[in-house]
Amino acid sequence: MRSEKKNTGLAAGAVLIAILIIIQIGDSYCSELYDKIQSLFLMDLIMNPLNMSLEDATVMINSVAIPFYAISLISPVFRGMVDYLGKKKVLLINLLLYIPGLLLCMTTRKYIVFLIGNSLISLSTSVDIQYIYIASFIDEKKRATVRGILAAAAALSAASVPVIRKVAITGRPYDYARMYGIGIAITAFVAVIVFIFLPWDKKQTTPEKITQLPTCGNKRNSALIYLYIVIFAWGAGTSGIKFYNEPMITMRFKTDYIINRILFIQPLITIIINIASGIMGDRYQGEKQSVQMWLPPLFR
């Protein structure tokens, strides 16, 4: 009887992880589009209509886009809704919010409207409800490993973008819209999978109370200091890699084969890093195991 319950629990955990991987793949694909095909929509939305160079168009759109990034600040509101609506409902709302953003980016011929659509995509990306599922259902001894697997799935999805770009982009005006159409199809598929297979939340009868907040002065929470070091170290490296983005690669090499190859290789490196860091994180004993759950997804 005990072995049957154990096998049932393992099967349920495997199904949950598989669903989370599917969610992460769709999430990563949609979030990577802006960075991976930037030179393509810049050409059709800004360079050709305004007779600008790629350098000037990149500076312009990054400057104009700054106010639109503020919409990502709403993401804590979405996470807070989990306590009232439940994880599955918020996750479905989050997924469905992708579709109008992708649709705007696919159909518009105005870069301002394009940025509005991209801001909706950025908002959906920043919520990351799947990590709440890890904290709620995955054993604490395996959380970092699962988190590493999801990060690797995200990197693999990011690596698929230049592959799809090579097939879908033909050089015609606005053909980047196909990439967003694929994003709509992927998001709809993920939403159906979540709706059918992910269990609905049970009502919580006894609210949990926070008895003590982690501080650096508390020796039992000394992992928080380690967390700060890791965030700053990885943040510096991530910023450097993000700075070397698709428009800069395009300006440097100007060859589709080399551009797609670089965009493909970068995420593959993060797959190794994320899986290794997750496995090593679970080998630590004590409270250092929780550090991995505090880390935001890398190389989004």
Predicted features, each with a name:
Residues L73-M106:
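Conserved MFS/SLC helix-loop-helix module at the cytosolic interface between two early adjacent transmembrane helices
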Residues G117-A152:
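Cytoplasmic helix-loop-helix junction between adjacent transmembrane helices
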Residues N62-G80, F264-A276:
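Central cavity-lining transmembrane alpha-helices of secondary-active solute carriers
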Residues R2-G13, W200-I229:
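Juxtamembrane intracellular "pre-TM" segments in multi-pass secondary transporters
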Residues K36-T58, F243-I259:
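Short amphipathic helix-loop junctions that connect adjacent transmembrane helices
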Residues A144-K166:
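Glycine-rich segments within core transmembrane alpha-helices of 12-TM secondary carriers
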Residues I25, I112-S126, F232:
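Hydrophobic core of transmembrane alpha-helices in multi-pass small-molecule transporters
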Residues Y84-L95, R283-P296:
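Cytoplasmic membrane-interface "Motif A"-like loop-to-helix N-cap segments
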